[in-house]
C-alpha cells in the first residue's frame, strides 16, 4: 500500500499514486476505499424548476439549445409549485431538496424568484440546495445571506478534457463558482460525469482537482447518452468495473466528502 510522504497532508496523493491504486486488484482497491466509508446513506431530491433552452453547448446535455433533443421546455416554476414538490420529496424520504434550473446563469428577475424559493423552503424546515449555474460574487453573497445551505455546481470533467465537452464557457468559470460558494460559507456539492470518453488518467485528474476544491459532497454521474447529442453513442465508454474503480479512487482522494452515485 502507498506510504505517505513525510510532512504532507495524508490525504494528498500524487497522480502516479492514485493511478497505481486504480490499477490494483479490484477487491483490494475496494477494501482500501472502505476504510473511509461511513455506515450511512443519504438521499437528496431535485426539483427541475426550469427546463431546456440552455445557451451552452455541453455535448452530453438534453437541455442544450444546440441539439435537437425534443425535450419539453418550460420557464421558471412558481414559488408555490416548488414548495409543493419539495414537500412531496421530503415525505418520500429526501434529506435535502435542490432547486435545479437550466441555463448558464439566471437573470436578475429569475434570481430574485429563486431567492424567494429558498426562503420559502427554509421557513418550511426543508434543507435547501440550489443548482442554478455559474455565479458571480454578488449572487453568491445573496444566496448565503438568504440562508441557502448547499450549492451544487459540477466541474463535470478534468481541466484537460473540458474543451472536448464544452466551448461556451471555461473550466475556470466552474472553478470560480465553486470558490465563491466556499468563500461565502455555503456547503459545496461538486462532482463529475464519467463515461464521456475521458481516459483513466483523466479520471485521476478529476479526483485530484476535486481534492483541491474540497467539496462536502461529490456526485459521480455515469453518462446516460441522450439521442441527438454529440455523445449519443457513448453508452459503451465505461464498464461496471471501471465505474467501481473510479468511485473507490474518488473516496480515497476525498475521504471527508460524501460520494453520491447518479445518472446524468
Where are these regions (language model features)?
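Core AdoMet radical
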Residues: 66-85, 89-178, 186-191, 216-221
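Conserved, mostly hydrophobic/aromatic
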Residues: 25, 58, 99, 153, ...
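Conserved C-terminal portion of the radical SAM core fold
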Residues: 123-125, 150, 172-230, 244-260
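Glycine-rich phosphate-binding "P-loop"
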Residues: 101-104, 229-239
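An N-cap/entry alpha-helix motif that binds or orients negatively charged groups
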Residues: 14-44
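Short, Lys/Arg-enriched N-terminal segments with co-localized hydrophobic residues
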Residues: 1-11
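Canonical Radical SAM [4Fe-4S] cluster-binding loop centered on the CxxxCxxC motif
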Residues: 8, 43-81
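Active-site-adjacent loop and "lid" segments of alpha/beta metabolic enzymes
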Residues: 236-238, 258-264
